[in-house]
């Protein structure tokens, strides 16, 4: 016997996110009535994660579904929603949820105008597009935006997929998405740069060296926040910071690299936060910034760690 409140779900976009969320909703006993898949990879993904679900045209999916999940790139979302509105595809009372981190429900105004219910359900995790993502959803948080009266519906859908909903105000969606992108996307760049440096000096498996350090650092940062801050910048060790900056300047000059710029930006941000926490005096902060900009020793020639 089917559970009450089960929906006919249509998935628009069988990319890594859409196919997995469709499978999660199906596991919660919702009926996936159709999926759109353009590329060969997306068709194969749909066949693997949503076996037996018909691959349909987008308008046919919207016509059949009580819940439409729009799992498409941010830049395509607005045009898709407006195009379907012009075709008269949206139905009164229909639930329409997009998975974009950047947008709230404002971009779904054509949906609202047709009497359908707009929801924004963004999973804060990276996806492989494979079944292992279904297990990872159990540790995932969704950024959820909806009208106040509809927020419980959005939250319930997330809980049914095994994840944790967190309400994000419409006005805060861009900051929310920027925070996640800054933490996740830029970490990949940071690891790539550090691995490149180690590989250049002969470390055969830089990932093996960095892995334990990065995992411990991440765990400490999540558990303790800025109290977990360590290293030469937080200690005011200007000599070491200066040596780092000079070495990276020389490395970038020879390799055409971009490491120094990233190191400078993050070290300056770290120094400001260390100063705000009282770990650095203003003079130390100035010397750190001078060392980062010039790669030279501070004007007094002393390591600012003295007196710490």
Feature map (PLM): residue ranges:
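Interdomain hinge/lid region at the active-site interface
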Residues: 218-284
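Internal alpha-helical scaffold of NAD(P)-dependent oxidoreductase catalytic cores
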Residues: 45-49, 111, 132-223, 252-254, ...
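Short phosphate-binding/catalytic loops that engage adenosine nucleotides
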Residues: 30-31, 116, 163, 203
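Short, hydrophobic beta-strand segments that form beta-sheet elements in well-ordered domains
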Residues: 33-37, 96-99, 144
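NAD(P)+-binding Rossmann beta1-loop-alpha1 motif at the extreme N-terminus of oxidoreductases
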Residues: 1-63
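Rossmann-like NAD(P)(H) cofactor-binding subdomain of soluble oxidoreductases
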Residues: 40, 44, 54-132
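NAD(P)-dependent dehydrogenase/reductase Rossmann-like domain
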Residues: 272-308
């Amino acid at each position: 016997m089917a559970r009450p409140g089960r929906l006919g779900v249509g998935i628009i976009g069988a990319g890594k996110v859409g196919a997995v969320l469709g499978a999660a909703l199906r596991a919660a006993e919702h009926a996936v009535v159709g999926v759109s898949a353009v590329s060969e990879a997306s068709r194969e993904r749909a066949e693997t994660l949503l076996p037996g679900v018909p691959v349909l045209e987008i308008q046919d999916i919207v016509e059949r579904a009580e819940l439409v999940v729009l799992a498409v790139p941010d830049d395509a979302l607005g045009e898709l929603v407006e195009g379907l509105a012009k075709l008269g595809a949206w139905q009164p009372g229909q639930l329409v949820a997009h998975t974009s981190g950047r947008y709230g429900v404002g971009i779904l105004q054509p949906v609202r105008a047709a009497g359908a219910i707009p929801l924004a359900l963004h999973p804060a995790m990276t996806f492989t597009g494979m079944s292992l993502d279904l297990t990872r959803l159990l540790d995932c948080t969704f950024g959820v935006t909806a009208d106040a009266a509809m927020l419980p519906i959005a939250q319930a859908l997330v809980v049914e997929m095994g994840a944790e909903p967190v309400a994000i105000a419409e006005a805060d969606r861009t900051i929310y998405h920027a925070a996640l992108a800054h933490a996740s996307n830029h970490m990949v760049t940071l690891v790539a740069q550090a691995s490149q440096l180690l590989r250049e000096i002969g470390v055969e498996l830089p990932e093996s060296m960095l892995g334990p350090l990065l995992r411990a650092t991440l765990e400490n940062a999540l558990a303790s926040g800025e109290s977990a801050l360590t290293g030469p910048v937080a200690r005011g060790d200007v000599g070491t910071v200066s040596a780092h900056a000079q070495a990276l300047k020389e490395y970038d000059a020879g390799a055409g690299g971009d490491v120094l710029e990233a190191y400078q930006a993050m070290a300056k941000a770290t120094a400001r936060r260390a100063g705000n926490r009282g770990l650095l005096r203003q003079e130390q902060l100035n010397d750190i910034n001078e060392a980062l900009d010039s790669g030279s020793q501070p004007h007094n020639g002393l390591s600012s760690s003295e007196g710490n």
